[in-house]
């Protein structure tokens, strides 16, 4: 007599685990493909641009409090290659945001340790995000401080550090970073604030734009506060520390 075999469905926990593993695998494959594609192709939008559009439809934009709900939100975003951005602009943002940019693999652990120590004893928190982290966050993610978002930011940071050159990371950063209400990238910022292309930015103008980057929701390039002017002066006085425009040529 032929024995009968009864095949039972695997336990629910196993099916859930298998489904999650499959989803994670698909996510990793798709994000690697996206990163490899964006190594050569300019992004048509970014996570932050999409987030700001959604906020504009709910009246929750972090900029003007005088806007009405479902405002006419018109993002200004114009991609230009790094060769059409004044080299001093790259020097200014590296001086301001991430002086170890050329040497780290996405994370400045010394700056992170200092920020943790500072935040334990001060009311206002200090960040330690590198240019690579900011690029990953602005391109692929959204604003927020949850552990899930921070974990995704770390993943995408490692991904672009692996797939892109430092030059490409800086190029994407300068093109998608937020400089003000609906103003994305240094070309749009140069045209909006100085009525000139990014290729013609002066040292003072580049330093001013870099000075608002810690928080473009609060600091303005068209009406700089005393803090922004002080920050601009500090950037101008410290750009030589990383080697000036020669720094960009070595990336």
Go through each PLM region and give its residues.
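Juxtamembrane regions of bacterial inner-membrane/periplasmic proteins
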Residues: 2-251
């Amino acid at each position: 007599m032929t024995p009968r075999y009864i095949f039972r469905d695997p336990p629910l926990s196993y099916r859930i685990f298998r489904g999650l593993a499959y989803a994670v695998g698909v996510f990793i494959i798709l994000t690697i493909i996206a990163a490899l594609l964006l190594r050569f192709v300019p992004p048509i939008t970014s996570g932050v641009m999409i987030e700001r559009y959604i906020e504009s439809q709910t009246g929750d934009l972090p900029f003007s409090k005088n806007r009405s709900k479902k405002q006419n939100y018109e993002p200004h975003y114009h991609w230009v290659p790094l060769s059409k951005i004044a080299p001093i602009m790259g020097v200014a943002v590296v001086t301001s945001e991430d002086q170890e940019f050329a040497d780290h693999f996405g994370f400045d652990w010394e700056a992170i340790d200092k920020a943790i120590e500072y935040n334990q004893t001060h009311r206002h928190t200090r960040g330690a995000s590198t240019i690579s982290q900011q690029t990953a966050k602005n391109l692929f993610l959204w604003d927020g401080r949850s552990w899930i978002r921070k974990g995704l930011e770390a993943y995408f940071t490692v991904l672009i550090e692996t797939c892109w050159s430092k030059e490409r990371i800086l190029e994407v950063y300068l093109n998608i970073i937020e400089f003000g209400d609906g103003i994305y990238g240094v070309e749009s910022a140069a045209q909006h604030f100085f009525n000139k292309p990014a290729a013609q930015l002066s040292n003072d103008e580049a330093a001013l734009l870099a000075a608002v980057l810690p928080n473009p929701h609060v600091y303005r390039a068209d009406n700089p506060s005393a803090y922004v002017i002080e920050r601009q002066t500090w950037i101008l006085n410290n750009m030589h520390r990383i080697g000036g425009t020669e720094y960009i040529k070595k990336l």
